[in-house]
Curated annotation (Swiss-Prot):
Key words of the record: Repeat
Classification via Pfam families: DUF2046
Polar residues bias spans: 472-496
Region (Disordered): 1-51, 467-497, 509-528
Region 2 X 29 AA repeats, residue ranges: 185-313
Recorded superkingdom: Eukaryota
UniProt keyword Repeat present: yes
PANTHER family, per database record: COILED-COIL DOMAIN-CONTAINING PROTEIN 6, H4 D10S170 PROTEIN-RELATED
Protein name: Uncharacterized protein T09B9.4
Sequence repeats: 185-213, 285-313
Length: 528
């Protein structure tokens, strides 16, 4: 089966008409190379790949004319008898041919050469002896047509695929061209806008410089005109010059008179200020003397109060109103030593009085000033000591009040303890009465123990001592023992009288023994 010849142009190119800017203005047409340059696609583009498919010599999709090729071209066909048997369309449309293929299985058959093209089929069997005769039969001619039909069908599918690829490439090229021209327009617009802004800025700068230049020119012109107007006329009248000189001389004389008057008034003011300074200094000295005398009197009063407070503290300490303290003891010793050594040279300095009426006292004398400074320092020291003693006095008063509160609390506790003691004595008396009623020997023992205690100390003294100490005497439970002789006899009598009776314990009140202790106000070193 011969294929129709298709002229293959030597120079085919894809030309884009860029005269317009719309998408419809881009037309794709194939033309000869008359007046246009050939189109050279890039190696990586889809167009180059699709065009390169036509350049392979042994490709299945290549269908060329015999005169364009130098020799015989061989094409391998991938279709065979099993593929024809598997086609349902052949089975339905050509049942006799299908039965022929199924019965004969002509796998040795290959299509006849056409226009210098030799067809080869894969997986062929050896040729039979009468293969030339068999080729002329109708079934084998039908088989040859089927081979060529499937070959052409395959070529058509490849051409459709290539056409589709070309259409896609054309579409991509159109989109790329539109994008390229859009981008070019955007860049052009951006450049034009930026240039327009720069031009506007330059125009504004130009206007500003022109205005500034005009303003500077006007100001310079005005200043020059003013300076020219201020320049005096050198060639003026001599009378005007003489008048000006006379005016200047009169001004100078007036200023000299004013300076002399001002100097005289300043001298008078200076003398007046010096006199006022002397008056103020004398008044200040008198006030200082008055203050010194007042402070001397106050210091004497404070010393008297200090002495009285020391005496009161000493009396309170000696009478026992204040507890023993090392600080108070040292202060009392110091006051006693000052009292015995009172005729010291510093006694006369405790109350200095400055006589302001004496004419011998002068503020300009350095000896008097030194004496005033010493007396002032001594007064300050005495004032500090007086303040310290006043603070100490407040502390002592607070301590006395605290001790008074403690003594009141102690008296309240003593009253409570006395009430408890009276209750305990009543209970003991009841116990004694009960013991007398129940057991005669036990009552006798209690009476003997009470008699012994009453012999040791009088009852009224015992009660006074117990109340003074503020605590009740301890009660001791004494178990009967057989250590004493008298107790042995009593126990034997009791056992004989009551052989099966249990011996009851003895309740005894133990009074503490009074020790000779030094008095509260007595010093520890007075015994020596």
């Amino acid at each position: 089966m011969e294929h129709p010849k298709r002229p293959t142009p030597k120079n085919e190119a894809l030309h884009i008409d860029a005269s317009g800017r719309g998408e419809s203005s881009f037309s794709v047409h194939r033309s000869h190379s008359g007046g246009h340059e050939p189109f050279a696609p890039s190696p990586g583009s889809s167009i180059g790949a699709s065009v390169s498919m036509f350049s392979s010599r042994n490709s299945e999709a290549e269908v060329g004319d015999a005169e364009d090729l130098d020799g015989v071209r061989t094409i391998m066909m991938n279709i065979g008898v099993p593929d024809l048997l598997a086609d349902r369309e052949i089975q339905m449309r050509y049942p006799e041919f299908y039965q022929f293929l199924l019965a004969e299985q002509p796998t040795w058959f290959e299509p006849a050469p056409s226009n210098g093209t030799v067809y080869r089929v894969h997986h062929t069997t050896p040729l039979p002896d009468n293969h030339k005769k068999l080729r002329k039969e109708l079934p084998f001619e039908m088989l040859d047509l089927m081979y060529r039909f499937f070959r052409q069908k395959h070529v058509n599918s490849q051409r459709k695929r290539e056409n589709k690829e070309l259409l896609e490439a054309n579409k991509q090229l159109r989109i790329a061209a539109v994008q390229m021209f859009t981008k070019a327009e955007q860049e052009e617009e951006y450049i034009s806008n930026s240039l327009l802004k720069k031009i506007q800025q330059l125009n504004q700068d130009k206007d500003y410089l022109v205005k500034k230049y005009q303003k500077d020119e006007e100001s310079l012109t005005k200043s020059l005109m003013a300076n020219v107007a201020k320049i005096p006329d050198v060639h003026g009248d001599e009378a005007a010059a003489e008048k000006l000189m006379a005016d200047k001389q009169a001004e100078i004389e007036r200023l000299r008179t004013y300076c002399s008057r001002a100097e005289k008034s300043y001298q008078e003011e200076l003398m007046r200020l010096r006199a006022e300074k002397v008056d103020h200094e004398s008044a200040l000295e008198q006030e200082q003397e008055l203050l010194i005398n007042t402070l001397g009197k106050r210091m004497s009063q404070m010393n008297e109060e200090k002495r009285k407070l020391q005496q009161a503290l000493e009396m309170a300490y000696l009478n026992g109103f204040v507890d023993f303290d090392d600080t108070v003891e040292v202060a009392l010793h110091a006051s006693a030593s000052q009292k015995y050594n009172g005729n010291s040279p510093n006694v006369s300095a405790n109350s200095p009085v400055v006589n302001t009426n004496s004419p011998a006292v002068s503020t300009s004398s350095p000896l008097v000033r030194n004496t005033d400074q010493q007396s002032t320092s001594s007064y300050r020291q005495q004032l500090n000591e007086t303040a310290h003693l006043h603070i100490e006095n407040k502390k002592l008063v607070g301590m006395c009040n605290q001790e008074r509160r403690r003594s009141q609390a102690t008296e309240a506790e003593v009253k409570k303890l006395n009430q408890r003691m009276s209750k305990m004595e009543a209970v003991l008396e009841a116990i004694r009465i009960e013991a007398v009623r129940t057991d005669g020997p036990l009552a006798w023992r209690l009476a003997a123990l009470s008699h012994d205690n009453s012999i040791d100390e009088p009852p009224h003294r015992m009660l006074a001592e117990r109340r003074a100490h503020g605590s009740s005497p301890p009660t001791v439970v004494v178990q009967p023992s057989t250590s004493r002789a008298g107790s042995n006899s009593t126990a034997n009598i009791n056992n004989d009288t009551h052989p099966h009776a249990q011996v009851a314990p003895i309740l005894a009140t133990v009074h503490p023994t009074q020790r000779a202790t030094p008095a509260r106000n007595e010093r520890p070193d007075s015994h020596y």
